[in-house]
Design a protein with these regions (language model features):
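AMP-binding/adenylate-forming catalytic core of the ANL superfamily
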Residues: 76-79, 86, 145, 192, ...
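Short hydrophobic "strand-cap" motifs at the C-terminus of beta-strands
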Residues: 39-40, 89, 118-119, 143, ...
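Short beta-strand-to-turn element immediately C-terminal to the catalytic PLP-Schiff-base lysine
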Residues: 4, 152-157, 177-178, 197, ...
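General small-molecule cofactor/ligand-binding pocket signal
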Residues: 62-64, 141, 321-324
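Conserved AMP-binding/adenylation subdomain of ANL enzymes
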Residues: 2-36, 43-87, 100, 104
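Gly/Ser/Thr-rich phosphate-binding loop
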Residues: 56-59, 83-88, 98-164, 168-175, ...
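Structural motif corresponding to alpha-helix initiation and N-cap regions
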Residues: 71-72, 125, 183-184, 257, ...
């Protein structure tokens, strides 16, 4: 290889490179090679896209041997393989991961882990803080997007600098628009639909109606609008509210289940929670919380409603409670 370097080109002195050095560059030095464990199913976009990206970069992709997610098995494999990256999908994975670490302090050598990444489901600030307490050298990447709208937003967390739940930096091709196609101004407090432009799918196969609803022309540009509602903070960051198709209408007020679920999960007696709307003769719908409690405790509707009310508007507090053994996520 002959290449005139900037500092030596005028002198006619090319830098020398050996064949072994070129081969090492192609293969990638050992310390830069990524070993990724994809804990998420490969049929899910998060697992599939992450695996393809890693393989295209020359990395190694590993799947867990069991058909059902087992956090202890994950940490065993991380230690055995000296994994550098872990791919998961929100709290359904990160909650048992943290519980396993808390129950087995110091059991695993996790010094190889450089990053943990998630997309497709909520990942709370509190859980991120807990995981980083056990793996302080790692970075956490929390991405917001969908199969038809990749790259809507992202947040990064490190030990002592955990990003807020459902708060994201907007991607370069992302905007937030009202239903009539007007762009939402930062800091206005106005709600809008998150949209992304750029490389987009042609549409949904044999579903012209859904394609027309999702892929829209706004400001002379084609956008993918999957249906997620958000506000734009004054600093330009995005506050995700939730998917409009599951929005609960109670007495004319819109309530996004995700924000109520997030509040419920902050209660000490709640391990997991799902919020749904149930028919109500007066308000049209009322908020029902389905809760999986921590072991040995039984939360009441009164205490959970008061807890949610302390963080959100009163009409967003659950009016009905169902306690189950497991949410099953």
């Amino acid at each position: 290889q002959v290449l005139g370097a900037g500092g030596n080109a005028a002198l006619g002195i090319p830098p020398a490179t050996s064949i072994p050095e070129l081969i090492e560059r192609i293969q990638g030095p050992e310390h830069l090679r990524a070993t990724m464990i994809v804990a998420a199913p490969l049929m899910h976009g998060t697992g599939q896209f992450s695996a393809i990206i890693s393989l295209n970069g020359g990395g190694t992709v590993c799947a867990l041997p069991s058909r059902k997610f087992d956090a202890v098995e994950l940490w065993n494999e991380v230690e055995r393989l000296k994994a550098t990256n872990i791919v998961l999908v929100g709290l359904a994975f990160s909650t048992p991961m943290l519980e396993a670490l808390e129950a087995n302090p110091g059991r695993w050598d996790l010094s190889s882990v450089r990053s943990m990444s998630s997309s497709g489901s909520m990942w709370s600030q509190e859980n991120k803080r807990g995981l980083l307490g056990h793996i302080p050298q790692a970075m956490i990447a929390d991405s917001f997007g969908s199969s038809e709208a990749v790259g809507l937003g992202a947040s990064a967390s490190a030990a002592g600098m955990e990003a807020q739940t459902a708060a994201f930096m907007l991607g370069p091709n992302t905007g937030v628009f009202t239903e009539d196609g007007r762009r939402v101004e930062p800091g206005s407090g106005e709600r809008g639909l998150v949209a992304v432009s750029g490389f987009l799918p042609m549409g949904y196969y044999k579903d012209e109606e859904k394609s027309a609803k999702t892929f829209r022309i706004m400001e002379g540009v084609r956008w993918s609008v999957p249906g997620d509602w958000a506000e734009v903070n004054a600093d330009g960051t995005l506050k995700l509210l939730g998917r409009g198709s599951v929005c609960i209408n109670t007495g004319g007020e819109k309530v996004f289940p995700e924000e109520v679920e997030e509040a419920l999960k902050r209660h000490a007696s709640v391990r997991d929670a799902v919020v749904v709307g149930v028919p109500d003769p007066r308000f049209g719908e009322r908020i029902c919380a389905v809760v999986e409690p921590e072991a040995g405790v039984l939360p009441t509707l009164a205490e959970l409603s008061a807890h949610v009310h302390s963080q959100l508007a009163g009409y967003k507090a659950p009016r009905e409670l169902v306690v189950v053994d497991t949410i099953g996520q």
